[in-house]
Design a protein with these regions (language model features):
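Soluble extracytoplasmic domains of inner/organellar membrane proteins
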Residues: 1-92
Length: 92
């Protein structure tokens, strides 16, 4: 399989399991995508940031939303949603 398809499958697995797993499990699933230059990296980071936000871990969420904003190849919709979340809910 093409690398980007593999990364999409990893992202979908994380998305499907995000309500059921711990922080460590989610990180373990997403690490291959987060540590790559994949087009799915911004999506994976956004999922992780929203996971932390839902767990009331606002500082971790804020750090990850900020990482998305400086990614050179971040999806523009993901970037905009990250900026909105920072402005609206995390005081940026």
């Amino acid at each position: 399989l093409d690398n980007e398809i593999k990364n999409l499958i990893i992202y979908k697995k994380a998305l499907f399991n995000s309500d059921l797993v711990s922080e460590n499990e989610l990180l373990k699933i997403l690490n291959p995508v987060i540590n790559s230059e994949s087009i799915w990296k911004s999506h994976a980071l956004y999922l992780l940031a929203e996971f932390f936000y839902s767990k009331e871990e606002k500082q971790k969420a804020k750090e990850i939303f900020n990482q998305i904003l400086v990614l050179p190849n971040a999806n523009s919709t993901i970037k905009n949603e990250s900026q909105k979340r920072l402005n609206r809910d995390l005081g940026e």
